Regions:
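Helix-to-loop junction immediately C-terminal to a conserved catalytic motif
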Residues: 49
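Conserved ABC ATPase "signature" region
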Residues: 87, 98-113
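Short, charged/small-residue-rich alpha-helical element at the C-terminal edge
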Residues: 216-288
Length: 288
């Protein structure tokens, strides 16, 4: 493991912000910490990167691990240009290649606005520059704390396409916090946190299959005997005289059932379970 957090907690007076959390991140994987605002995500990240000390517990890195961090709030100078900001930051690291700044400007698509002052950039442009700053020294482990908060859907997608590409090319380990549940769909490992505790963990597929319900809605040509439908082993609920809602455990089960009753079907809809469904099932509320 490139990083392990063993039974870490953080207390502020009588308030327990993080409660006995255990995390493990394998080298080269994409990891997500999900949860509503106030769940303890940012406090956890702050402990992992050393900005805050745990009240109890232990954080263990592989020896020699280099980390990069994209903070919620930028640490760059708004009055300097993109290139000036990156050049000044690059001087803080020893042994960087002379063309490192230019290389990142090209790879992250910053060329068109590299001479603009950072403070004049759009939200998406600033995020790209923030990511470039975090990558200057070639980190083994990249932390991103709510990196796309406040950005529109198209900009969020472009940022995530970039991050997935960089993660594959660089072989980095990535750890992000977010309350946009769709951003974790490709993650190798997800930790869902609420009230400072890990309430579920696993791959996106594992969590969705365990906590999210698939919905198969069928309108039959004629009224059906609900007992005969229940005998097939799926949960079923009658919505109207001809409409029934089933909860197949998998897409395969839905397809097999549709094949069995295809001659009786007037119309059907299938909606696979989502991370939003899983989150609501786990926390009892939508992410906020």
């Amino acid at each position: 493991m490139i990083l392990q957090a063993k039974n870490i907690s953080k207390r502020y007076g009588n308030h327990l912000a993080v409660d006995n959390i255990q995390l493990q991140f394998k080298r080269g994987t994409f990891n997500a910490i999900l949860g509503p605002n106030g769940a303890g995500k940012s406090t956890t990240i702050s402990m992992l990167i050393g900005l805050k000390q745990p009240t109890q517990g232990e954080i263990i890195y592989e020896p020699g691990t280099k980390i990069g961090v994209v903070f919620q709030t930028s640490v760059l100078d708004e009055m300097l240009t993109v290139r000036e900001n990156l050049t000044i930051r690059a001087r803080q690291y020893k042994g960087l290649k002379p063309n490192r700044v230019s290389d990142l400007i090209d790879r992250l698509g910053l060329s068109a606005f590299q001479k603009q002052k950072y403070g004049t950039l759009s939200g998406g442009q600033k995020r790209r520059v923030d990511i470039a700053r975090a990558l200057l020294h070639g980190p083994d482990l990249l932390f991103l704390d709510e990196p796309t908060t406040g950005l529109d859907i198209q900009t969020r997608k472009s940022i995530w396409d970039l991050l997935y590409q960089l993660q594959r090319e660089e072989g980095m380990t990535v750890v992000l916090t977010t309350h946009y549940l769709d951003e974790a769909d490709e993650a190798d490992q997800i930790y869902i946190v609420d009230h400072g505790e890990v309430i579920a963990q696993g791959s996106a597929l594992d969590i969705k299959s365990q906590y999210a319900k698939n919905i198969l809605k069928i309108r039959f040509k004629e009224r059906q005997q609900i007992e005969s439908l229940k005998s097939l082993g799926m949960s079923v609920e009658q919505q109207s005289q001809l409409e029934y809602i089933f909860q197949p455990k998998s897409e395969r089960e839905a397809i097999d059932y549709l094949a069995q009753v295809r001659d009786r079907i007037a119309h059907f809809e299938f909606r696979p379970g989502t991370m939003d469904d899983a989150f609501i099932a786990l926390t009892g509320r939508e992410v906020r």
